[in-house]
From Swiss-Prot:
Keywords: Cell cycle, Cell division, Cell membrane, Cell shape, Cell wall biogenesis/degradation, Magnesium, Membrane, Metal-binding, Peptidoglycan synthesis, Transferase, Transmembrane, Transmembrane helix. It is a multi-pass membrane protein. Signal peptide: none annotated. The lineage of its organism: Bacteria, Bacillati, Bacillota, Bacilli, Lactobacillales. GO terms for cellular component: plasma membrane. Catalyzes the initial step of the lipid cycle reactions in the biosynthesis of the cell wall peptidoglycan: transfers peptidoglycan precursor phospho-MurNAc-pentapeptide from UDP-MurNAc-pentapeptide onto the lipid carrier undecaprenyl phosphate, yielding undecaprenyl-pyrophosphoryl-MurNAc-pentapeptide, known as lipid I. Its EC number is 2.7.8.13. GO terms for molecular function: metal ion binding; phospho-N-acetylmuramoyl-pentapeptide-transferase activity. It is an enzyme of class 2 (transferase). This is Phospho-N-acetylmuramoyl-pentapeptide-transferase. The chain crosses the membrane at residues 3-23, 53-73, 79-99, 119-139, 144-164, 176-196, 200-220, 227-247, 250-270, 315-335. Its main location: membrane.
Amino acid sequence: MTMSLIAGVAAFVLTVLAMPHFITYYKIKKIGGQQMHEDVKQHLAKAGTPTMGGTVFLVVAILISLIFNFHVFTEGHQAYGATAGILFVILIYGIIGFLDDFLKIFHQINEGLKPWQKMALQIVAGLLFYFIHVLPSGTNSLAIGGLTIQLGVFYVLFVLFWIVGFSNAVNLTDGIDGLASVSVVISLIAYGIIAFVKGELAILTIIITMIGALLGFFVFNHKPAKVFMGDVGSLSLGAMLAVISIALRVEWTLLLIGVVYVLETASVMLQVSYFKYTKRKYGEGRRIFRMTPFHHHLELGGISGKGEKWSEWKVDAFLWTIGALASSITLWMVLGNVMK
């Protein structure tokens, strides 16, 4: 536990030291920055803000996790599969996000990777995690409380759905200063506690290291943000949460611990579906929310969508609180079951 905390502190310090150099390089090279939604006028001032900051905290977190888990890879440790699988997913999804950002910024391709290209790469990465960790572990079921749901060969489909789904869900959440970074920290704290109670210290080290790196990133990402994480950060973080929940055998908990990401994704799906339905039925598309993902709806008019505009800090605080409460309830449920 002590070494895990040292790893977290080291990740925080290195990220804080490295990020200013990244931001300065970005500005000196006059690299194109983040594009903003015109519908949210208060965001227009952020146009040109450096993005791809996730590159820094991912590199820091991966390197420090490897150093502090070196014994896992050299001594045939029982946690080898889970540790290697989690770090592999963080790296590969980070690379996918990096390619997406790179095409948008350096080649001025607005959509980055084509949707089918991004999805194909995410599925391949998810399959590799399945073969690295899940298949060797023999896992093919979901445990929810005292209920076990046998999925057999279909468990691989669940793994792919979970990883790809939450990767993109966190990506949708990363829309205002600090929202995604702190939301993921809250989620990781919950999984860190579960990992500690289960004695999964190698996974705990990865979790605490990423928490440290994200807190270091938040120093520059809180409002007014000096840098954004980009897809390189958000896609990787979402996939990381998914594989950690799988490795700890508490997959279902991500629906609650990750309730903010679920809410953001659900808002987009509902908006699109309702718009298409009303367009077919009435000849014009109608909306449930002022704008999606949900954090933009809050910005434009609060919960009802018709009130005063919310500041980014207020939106952050509201969604962070929801995430923290949901994580606390989940921990109460999980730890009560584990300690019986």
